[in-house]
């Protein structure tokens, strides 16, 4: 008799996605991050749902409701810190996942790649709005500064900002709508994830060599389910260690002061996972130029497939491209560090050099070095 998982209308979809899915036999640990992102998303939606049961989206009570969750709700502090640090784990996995795609040439599956970029924007928007909800000093001023960037758009900028704020400043209306969007966006992310997987399963996974793996495929279960479970355990161990031993490690101390429109914090900065983009924004003295650079720092990923000039897909056998890739990683880490520093010498000039390098590596050096490699290999 045929197994029910292969005949049942719902189960056969799951079966073809997670059980009998043909997968390349040589996938490395870098292919774990897709499933880790799924776990992060599920954990964020669950903890967020329970937090929303106790949170009030009102300027007068938002800060106190978060304090109430931590002090009075059973294991509320665990929920709150799992959610806050879970976001950090989410972004670590996201950046490693994108980095894997860049290194191994997975971006040549352009539909999957472009849906992935949409997902990245959606998750970033969700995280930004979530950071506003505790209504601390950094929540309020972060929301004010980042939404104000839209005023750089010619003609409609000022009206657009006031429309988003729901008034003439960040206030109750802003907080309420941000809570609504923060609750809604993760479900849009789930829908996008399904489309992402749909397109991925049309082509099948790439593999570290970048060579078609059709002659050598193995079933996803049990080979990769067991590898994924190991990944889950490692990630959950790191997350629980962070939550239970130093939950505020990645937080900003300013956010433990209730929002005060009359008192500006000395250094307004976003969460650590946005610092690289914030550094690029700050490195350009012109407001509109900075906003464009900020958007392009992520949007540049869209044209990466077009700039692929190598005859090989993966960087596995391309040592020159590998050096350049790790140089790009170092540049991003430098930008992350600069984003958290005050706007003064020498940080400004380091940020400007790193920003120029970031765009130059992706737009100029990567395609050129690939052409050089082709020439050296007589291709």
UniProtKB/Swiss-Prot annotation:
GO terms for biological process, alphabetical: mitochondrial electron transport, ubiquinol to cytochrome c
Membrane topology reported for the UniProt record: Multi-pass membrane protein
GO cellular-component term (any): mitochondrial inner membrane
Co-factor: note: Binds 2 heme b groups non-covalently.
Annotated positions binding heme b b562: 83, 182
Assembly description: The cytochrome bc1 complex contains 11 subunits: 3 respiratory subunits (MT-CYB, CYC1 and UQCRFS1), 2 core proteins (UQCRC1 and UQCRC2) and 6 low-molecular weight proteins (UQCRH/QCR6, UQCRB/QCR7, UQCRQ/QCR8, UQCR10/QCR9, UQCR11/QCR10 and a cleavage product of UQCRFS1). This cytochrome bc1 complex then forms a dimer.
Name the UniProt record assigns to this protein: Cytochrome b
Taxonomic placement: Eukaryota, Metazoa, Chordata, Craniata, Vertebrata
């Amino acid at each position: 008799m045929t197994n029910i998982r292969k005949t049942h209308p719902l189960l056969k979809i799951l079966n073809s996605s997670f059980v009998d899915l043909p997968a390349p036999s040589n996938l490395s640990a870098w292919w774990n991050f897709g499933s880790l992102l799924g776990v992060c998303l599920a954990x964020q939606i669950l903890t967020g749902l329970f937090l929303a049961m106790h949170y009030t989206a009102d300027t007068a009570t938002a800060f106190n409701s978060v304090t109430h969750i931590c002090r009075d709700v059973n294991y509320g502090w665990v929920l709150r810190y799992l959610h806050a640090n879970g976001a950090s784990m989410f972004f670590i996995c996201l950046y490693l996942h994108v980095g894997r795609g860049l290194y191994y040439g997975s971006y040549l599956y352009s539909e999957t790649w472009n849906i992935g970029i949409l997902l990245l924007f959606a998750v970033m928007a969700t995280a930004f709005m979530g950071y506003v909800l505790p209504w601390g000093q950094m929540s309020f001023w972060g929301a004010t500064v980042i939404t104000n960037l839209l005023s750089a758009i010619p003609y409609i900028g000022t009206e657009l900002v006031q429309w988003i704020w729901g008034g003439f400043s960040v206030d109750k209306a802003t907080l309420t709508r941000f809570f609504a969007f923060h609750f809604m966006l993760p479900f849009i992310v789930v829908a996008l994830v399904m489309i992402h997987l749909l397109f991925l399963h049309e082509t099948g996974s790439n593999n570290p060599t970048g060579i078609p793996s059709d002659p050598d495929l193995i079933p996803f279960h049990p080979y990769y389910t067991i590898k994924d479970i190991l990944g889950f355990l490692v990630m959950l161990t790191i997350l629980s260690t962070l939550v239970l031993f130093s939950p505020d490690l990645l937080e900003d101390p300013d956010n433990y002061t209730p929002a005060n429109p009359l008192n500006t914090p000395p250094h307004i900065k976003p969460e650590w996972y946005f610092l690289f983009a914030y550094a690029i924004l700050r490195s350009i003295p012109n407001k509109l130029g900075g906003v464009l650079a900020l958007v392009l720092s992520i949007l540049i990923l869209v044209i990466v497939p077009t700039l692929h000039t190598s005859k090989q897909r993966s960087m596995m056998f391309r040592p020159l491209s590998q050096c350049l890739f790790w140089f790009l990683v170092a540049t991003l880490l430098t930008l992350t560090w600069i984003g958290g520093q005050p706007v003064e010498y020498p940080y400004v000039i380091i940020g400007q050099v790193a920003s120029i390098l970031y765009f130059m590596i992706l737009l100029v050096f990567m395609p050129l070095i690939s052409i050089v490699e082709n020439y050296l290999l007589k291709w």
